[in-house]
A protein has these predicted regions:
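Compositionally biased, intrinsically disordered low-complexity regions enriched in proline and serine
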Residues: 25, 90-92, 114, 138
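A small-molecule sensor/coupling module
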Residues: 12, 71, 77-80, 95-132, ...
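Regulatory nucleotide-sensing modules
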Residues: 1-89, 96-100, 144-145
Length: 145
């Protein structure tokens, strides 16, 4: 998984023992936008649909992950809803389990903050694009009327 590619193998092994297996059926809600995030997810098999009121809908599939920001910034509200687009096998990691392992691997914290920062920047770019498109849409409407 890309999120853990540069991580200490012992750190990854410790986390793997704490992963919880979860199964979702088509159209099951996995994450609700606006709620406080307490865990991240890894897709073992299946496809999920990520829907946000502020960004275009996207799909994630086998090997992808989502919700990682909640491990780094645990009181942040979810910026998107996630639904199963097929029968999904997921593994989840809670913020409590993540932090308990992180206590023994302090150097990993920097790595995860950097990765989370990259994901936040990607989300900001989508939000900016969304607002630019809305602005242009209303300008075109004004010109037509």
């Amino acid at each position: 998984m890309p999120f853990f590619q540069k991580a200490d193998p012992e750190f990854v092994s410790a986390l793997v023992t704490l992963l919880k297996f979860e199964v979702y059926l088509f159209n099951d809600e996995i994450i609700r936008e606006g709620t406080i995030g307490r865990k991240m997810f890894f897709i073992s098999r299946g496809t999920v649909r990520v829907c946000s009121s502020k960004a275009p809908t996207t799909n994630l599939t086998d090997g992808s992950f989502f919700g990682e920001i909640s491990l780094i910034l645990p009181n942040l509200r979810r910026v998107a809803s996630v639904y199963a687009d097929s029968y999904c096998y997921l593994y989840s990691l809670t913020v409590e389990d993540f932090n308990s392992v992180l206590e023994n691997f302090p150097m990993q914290r920097k790595h995860f903050y950097a990765e989370a920062g990259k994901r936040l920047e990607q989300m900001k770019a989508w939000v900016k694009l969304f607002f630019i498109l809305i602005f242009l849409y209303f300008k075109v409407i004004q010109l037509i009327l």
